[in-house]
């Protein structure tokens, strides 16, 4: 369930009809927002990764970080209590901001294996239409997809996957997005073996 969906033109920041931008050339980040007063988990790291990806795709125009921060501030109500997911998506024409209800995963959770590797998987780009097609048919509190390529499990549709064997933790070495949560766990765990 969406609490908010808005899109804005670059530079002028004029509000326009909402587009989620899935499938476009562009990037996005999704951040957990919770509590009152509002806290966005790992906010600086998410924004840093977003700007880094914009630079790689040559979408990093002058002032874009300032505009993104302004739009987040505009759309987050500090008088509300949140437990939502805040998504910021950017292409060459607009910035889209949305807030949706966060669904808490249940302990009994399963993965549907699909033969798919994301385009430029090291980046959090908007080429997610096939993944979203599968996810839309699932109860996302109990199920996700696991992307497989050349007989290797890479990542889920929404998260990294870590494998545990004999008290050692493993992760694919390539064709995955090593996001903010992955980096957080790597620091906490101390060592993730890449294979």
Q: Where on the chain are the PLM-derived regions?
A:
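Dinucleotide-binding Rossmann-like beta1-alpha1 core, especially the glycine-rich loop
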Residues: 87
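Short N-terminal helix-loop-first-beta-strand/juxtamembrane motif that initiates sensory/input modules
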Residues: 82-84, 143-144
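Non-catalytic, solvent-exposed interaction/assembly segments
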Residues: 78-80
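Helix-start/capping segments and mature chain N-termini
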Residues: 1-74, 91-195
């Amino acid at each position: 369930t969406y609490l908010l969906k808005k899109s804005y033109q670059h530079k002028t920041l004029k509000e326009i009809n909402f587009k989620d931008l899935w499938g476009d050339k562009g990037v996005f980040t999704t951040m957990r927002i919770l509590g009152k007063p509002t806290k966005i988990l790992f906010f600086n790291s998410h924004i840093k990764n977003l700007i880094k990806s914009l630079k790689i795709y040559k979408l990093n125009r002058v002032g874009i970080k300032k505009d993104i921060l302004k739009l987040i501030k505009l759309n987050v109500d500090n008088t509300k209590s949140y437990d939502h997911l805040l998504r910021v998506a950017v292409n060459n024409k607009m910035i889209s901001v949305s807030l949706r209800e966060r669904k808490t995963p249940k302990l009994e959770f399963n993965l549907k294996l699909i033969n798919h590797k994301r385009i430029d998987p090291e980046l959090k780009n908007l080429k997610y239409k096939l993944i979203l097609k599968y996810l839309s048919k699932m109860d996302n509190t109990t199920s996700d997809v696991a992307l497989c390529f050349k007989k290797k499990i890479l990542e889920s549709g929404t998260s990294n996957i870590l494998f545990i064997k004999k008290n050692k933790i493993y992760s694919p070495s390539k064709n995955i997005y090593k996001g903010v949560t992955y980096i957080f766990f790597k620091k906490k765990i101390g060592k993730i073996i890449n294979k």
